[in-house]
Every structure is written in C-alpha cells, then in structure tokens.
Amino acid sequence: MGPRQGRWWLLLWLPPLATLPVRGEAAAAALSVRRCKALKEKDLIRTSESDCYCYNQNSQVEWKYIWSTMQVKITSPGLFRIVYIAERHNCQYPENILSFIKCVIHNFWIPKESNEITIIINPYRETVCFSVEPVKKIFNYMIHVNRNIMDFKLFLVFVAGVFLFFYARTLSQSPTFYYSSGTVLGVLMTLVFVLLLVKRFIPKYSTFWALMVGCWFASVYIVCQLMEDLKWLWYENRIYVLGYVLIVGFFSFVVCYKHGPLADDRSRSLLMWMLRLLSLVLVYAGVAVPQFAYAAIILLMSSWSLHYPLRACSYMRWKMEQWFTSKELVVKYLTEDEYREQADAETNSALEELRRACRKPDFPSWLVVSRLHTPSKFADFVLGGSHLSPEEISLHEEQYGLGGAFLEEQLFNPSTA
C-alpha cells in the first residue's frame, strides 16, 4: 500500500535531510529540545557553557503586538556559530509550506561564524530552538532578549501586500512593471528566469513544474545565503556585485523587451492572479499575529463585494468637498478685439429681444408712437431695420473714431493723463 496522498512528496526530502553533512550536526542531533533553556522577554544571560535555547510560541495574543518581533542578540569576544535545532515533526509533518521551506533552508544552511549574531523571532508562530557552539574551547557569551514593538520591515511587507492586491490588475497591464519585474526576476532568480526562457523546449508539463520547484528552492536558498553576507559582499566584492547586476539585468531587460509586454487577456489575467496570490503571501508574512493575518486575508478576498460601496463613499466625499470648498475665482482680462466682439454680440441680442417685445399683441404701440419724435424710424427698427441713422453713425465716428475729438482730448489733455 502506497503512502497516503496529499503529503507523500515530503518523504522525498527525508533521505537527503537525514544524511546531510552540516557542521555541528552531531551535537545538534544529540541535544533534546525538552532540556533546552526557555527564553523570555528581557532575559539577559551570561554564560560560558555551550547550550541550547528555545523561544516558545506565545499563546496569549495581544493586538498591540501585531507587527512586533523578538530580537535575540548574542555577543561574545570570540567566534561562535548558531545551529538551529529542527524538531522531528517540523520537517516530516510541517504545518504549512512556509514551515517546510524554513526547515529545508535551515538543514541545508552552513552556520556562519561571528562574534555578534541577532536572531529575529516571530513570537506568535512556531517555536524556535538553537544552540550556541564556540569555535574555540575557551568561550563566554551573552544573550539579550528584547521585543521590537513596531518592526517597520514587517509593517512594510504588510503594506506592500495590500498595495499589490488592490493594484494587481493595473500592474499586470503596465509595460513598465513587466520590464522592471522581469529584470528583477533575472537578477535575483536567474535559474527561474532561464527556465522560463527554455520552457518551449521542455516537452512535458510535469517535467517543467518539477524543474520549476527545484529552481525556486535553489533560488530562495541562494538569495537567503547572499542576504546574510550582503554587507561583506558589498564592501569586499563591490565591483563583482555591480558587474553581475548590470550584466544580468541588461540581458534580462533585453529578453523581456524582445518578447514584448503581455498582449493577450489570458496572460494578463494569469499574471494578475499570480500577483494577488503573492500579495496574500506578503500579507501573511507581514503580520506577527496569525489571527490578524487570516482576518486581513479574508477581508481582502471579500473586498470585491465592497467595490461599489467604496465607490459610493468616494463619490460622496467628492461632493462634500465640492460643497464646502470655495473655488478660487480666475480673472481673465479681455483684449480689445474680444471686447468689441462681445459688445457687438450682446448689443445685437438685446436689440433683437426688444424687437420681439414690440411685436407682441399686448404691446402699447399707440402710446409709444404718440411719445416718439420720429415714429417712422421706430417702425423701421421693429420691421428689422437699423436703430441708428446714417447721420448718427457719421457723427459717432467723428467724435469717437480715429482722429476724433474724444481721442485727441484723451491723448493731448494733461489733466486726463
């Protein structure tokens, strides 16, 4: 009878993990988690004995510590290494895929020798156990446990996950995001990037996905190793790091530019859902309290039904701003030509309105005619004629036109200057 379906593939990792030659393996295997010393907040331990320590999961959840982490700082005059003690059930029966990845990385990890090491622990997740092993026989060290109430790195990861979830559709359709993410993928995960390029030459999907899982594990392992030695790499091998980033980034950008951005809706939809899945992982990893992480994920997943209420609230906010915010009046000065055009238009409109009023049946025409000096001129105006006679137009031009008396008085009279 074969192994139970669901997690049988985890058994493939047990033989290499069981026979993996890691330094300090014999000592780590001999140590039992039960006799390790328990660490608590504000502990300060000074000792010269090589021992193991555990920080147990905190069962009492306090919401003010949503983005808090525990920092275990180990200092010593001499060199030492930290060996993580992976409990048996952590590798064989992991709680989730993230726990399994951490277990695999810790088993493959080569302990780093240093005289100062800081371990970041999530207080509400799995129990973390480690042992302090000296390089030399004469050895003393100090352990200081402190709580970082607001871990900004954790908070930024959470904010990045929320932002990525809501803008996944926009980013999946953006050529800039396509080129930049492809370049970053080529620099950080070269194996995954190369595998995506040669995908067409792999006949079976099962083979491709098996290679993809292997490339992802290898890439994560390499990135985690390099992150530990990032300062040393930057100060000692700055030229090589810059050369690698520039060369690999340039070729990655060229390959992405050659293939062009995603054009069909199926590829864009696939990228959008991958970004949303990645955003949920970031939200889960960016919160110390699992209960809050689950609530945030459920709220994000149900946010599609809140789309219309949010739009209604946004519209009401815009209307309220329109009602209570006074707009600044913009004054625009007219040119002389614009002034003449508007004056002519308004004058003609007013004269036409006056003609319509005079043509109405209830207009007192006899009373008006009895009071006019020239009734014939008024009759011509009502029938569509001009309201000015040629003599009046000529007199106006003589007084107010070019060379007229009014203009000369304005130009040459000192009192009007």
Swiss-Prot record:
It is a multi-pass membrane protein. The keyword Ligase does not apply. The keyword Nucleus applies. Keywords: Membrane, Nucleus, Signal, Transmembrane, Transmembrane helix. It is found in: Nucleus inner membrane. Residues 1-24 form the signal peptide. GO terms for cellular component: nuclear envelope; nuclear inner membrane. The chain crosses the membrane at residues 148-168, 177-197, 207-227, 239-259, 280-300. Its main location: nucleus. Belongs to the NEMP family. This is Nuclear envelope integral membrane protein 2. It comes from Homo sapiens. The gene is NEMP2.
